[in-house]
Design a protein with these regions (language model features):
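C-terminal domain-boundary segment and adjacent tail
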Residues: 18, 182-254
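Active-site-adjacent pocket scaffolds in enzyme catalytic domains
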Residues: 79, 84-202
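Active-site beta->alpha N-cap acidic-glycine motif
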Residues: 1-48, 230-232
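Generic structural signal for well-ordered alpha-helices
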Residues: 9-13, 36-39, 68-75, 101, ...
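Hydrophobic beta-strand scaffold residues
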Residues: 23, 49, 111, 239-240
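Active-site beta-loop-alpha junctions enriched in small/polar residues
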Residues: 28-30, 54-56, 91-94, 116, ...
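Acidic-and-aromatic substrate-binding clefts and catalytic sites of carbohydrate-active enzymes
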Residues: 2-6, 24-36, 57-68, 90-98, ...
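Conserved, mostly hydrophobic/aromatic
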Residues: 16, 49-52, 89, 104, ...
Length: 254
């Protein structure tokens, strides 16, 4: 929304500058064109721009032709904005269609961050996965079958998680019955800190937090992020990187 562009983006940029952190902004084409000065500032301050559809349209609701046209258009928008072709993508609604993976590979996208087959460790996306939905109108023998995993592709997945997303618990949306908006940032801090502590104890991995300018750009969000960043920075060996850097680190070890 307008608050995100006018207020949330500048606040988050100042937050990241405060700690010298470079981040990845998966930005809708609509936002790039509606708030050009703010988005130019994101690039000027050294952050990565990733793809995120045009108007947050759901890939599952589109034809392959529509999905590809939007992908190509937003690639052009990000390239014009940042001066280089984007290498990362996050699907609106975190939804992959049957052709999303193939389209990303076809058009040179190196990594995605929309899937949740792991929490903290990148992996290669598979295409052609098949599972059998329950069909009460059919003989159970037709659907009592295990999931069949498809072929591994060259697309790297830097996973995301609903449990590391600021929006579901902290953004009120009138038309969405499961939105909240009044969950205390202290609760979110404890949830995220506990997950971080588990990963830190387990060993190496990525900690992929998803935040939004219209949520974390609120005063209570900024203060919580300061606290979380300072806590994570206090742990030896912790570094903050962009998603592109996480992807390259994963590939360098293969």
């Amino acid at each position: 929304g307008v608050f995100a562009g006018r207020v949330g983006i500048p606040r988050l940029l100042d937050l990241f500058d405060r700690y010298g952190i470079k981040t990845t902004w998966f930005s809708c084409g609509h936002s790039i064109e509606t708030f050009p000065e703010q988005m130019k500032d994101v690039v000027a301050r050294g952050h990565e721009i990733g793809l995120h559809g045009y108007s947050h349209e759901n890939p599952l609701a589109m034809t392959p032709e529509q999905e590809e046209k939007i992908l190509l258009h937003t690639i052009d928008l990000v390239t014009e904005l940042s001066g280089k072709k984007p290498v990362g993508y996050r699907a609106p609604w975190w939804e992959f269609s049957k052709v999303t993976n193939d389209l990303l590979v076809k058009h040179g996208i190196k990594y995605d961050s929309s899937l949740m087959h792991d929490e903290f460790h990148p992996y290669f996306v598979t295409t052609g996965d098949k599972w059998y939905p329950i069909r009460y109108d059919q003989d159970p023998d037709t659907w009592m079958k295990p999931m069949e995993f498809g072929k591994e592709t060259d697309l790297v997945e830097v996973p995301c998680s609903w449990y590391l997303d600021d929006l579901p618990p902290q953004m009120f949306i009138k038309s969405s019955p499961n939105s909240f908006g009044w969950v205390s940032p202290d609760v979110i801090f404890e949830l995220w800190k506990n997950q971080f502590d588990f990963l830190y104890e387990e060993g190496e991995g990525v900690f992929p937090i998803t935040i939004h300018p219209d949520v974390s750009g609120r005063p209570q969000g900024i203060l919580m992020h300061r606290k979380l960043i300072e806590y994570m920075r206090s742990k030896p060996g912790v570094t903050f990187v962009t998603y592109a850097e996480a992807c390259e680190d994963f590939l360098s070890k293969k």
